[in-house]
Each structure stands twice: as C-alpha cells, then as structure tokens.
Amino acid sequence: MTQPSSGGIKRECNSCSSEHFPRVNPVVIMLIISNNKVLLGRGKGWPEGAMSALAGFISPGETIEEAVKRETYEEVGIKIKNAQYVFSQPWPWPSQLMIGMVCEADNEDLNINTDEIEEAKWFTKDQVKAVYDNSGDHFLKLPKFTIAHHLLRNWIES
C-alpha cells in the first residue's frame, strides 16, 4: 500500500519506504478562433448546453502544436494555423497537465466527429462576454478554477 506525500507529487510505500512518482499525462486544450468567434464543443456525456474549449491527449512523439492540429481535425474537421501557447494548469483528475493554446481556424465549416464529441458551435465574442457578465445564455459558465475559463476570459478581454 502506498500513501501520497509531498503534496501528491509522489507516493511512498508503507512497508519498504520506496518512492513512486505518478505519471503525468499532457493534454492540449485550445481556443480555436475565426473572425472574432470562438469554437466550443460539448464532450460525450456532458449535460445538454455545457460547452468548453476542445481538448485532447498528446500522443507519444507528438509536439504540442501537432497535437492541437490533430485533435482539432479529429474532433471537428478543421485545419488550424498559428497555434500559440498561453498558459498551463495541473489537473489532478487523472494526473494531467493541461496546456492552454490559442489558434486560428482555416475555415468555419464544421465536420463534427460524434465519436469524439457531442456537438460544436461557433460563438461570437459578445455571446461569450454576455455569459461572463451574467447577462447571456449560460452555455458555458465554466468554474473559475478551470483553464478553459481563463482561456476564454483572456480572449474576451483582448
């Protein structure tokens, strides 16, 4: 049996005191922008109307930028350009490092892969701002501790 120690960054064996360092899985989460609009999606099993930035795991041997391109194309059939790192966030469920990116879409024609996500839609900056100002349709009221919340907040304030 092991117990967490050092704030959860390692586990120590109760019987032999050996240290184990849990794996951290890198994940890209990206705001896809086009003509002052942002693309948001609803994941499998999420409540109706719950929208967030698209995201996906980075595959072994893949760069962050390659993962952004692949995940975006897999989920919504859009090619992207100019992927830029914004900031990151550790996510403990299950041991992920969320890597926040912003990128531009080549076009706005969606080809949604329903094996990956339930739906995706383009939203204007005014629509997103209204949600954050508590005056609009609450399609994405994301908890303030999430990286998606901060990516969107950055975008509407830019």
Give the predicted meaning of each segment.
Residues 89-112:
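Active-site-adjacent beta-strand/loop module that shapes the phosphate/pyrophosphate-binding cleft
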Residues 79-86:
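A short coil-to-beta-strand element that immediately follows conserved catalytic motifs
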Residues 26-37, 42-54:
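Histidine/lysine/aspartate-rich catalytic loop segments that bind and position anionic ligands
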Residues 54, 68, 72:
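Hydrophobic alpha-helical positions that pack around
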Residues 3-4, 47-51, 93, 114-158:
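Nudix hydrolase/Nudix homology domain
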Residues 38, 59-65:
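Glycine-rich phosphate/ribose-binding loops and adjacent secondary-structure elements
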Residues 1-31:
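Cys/His-rich short segments
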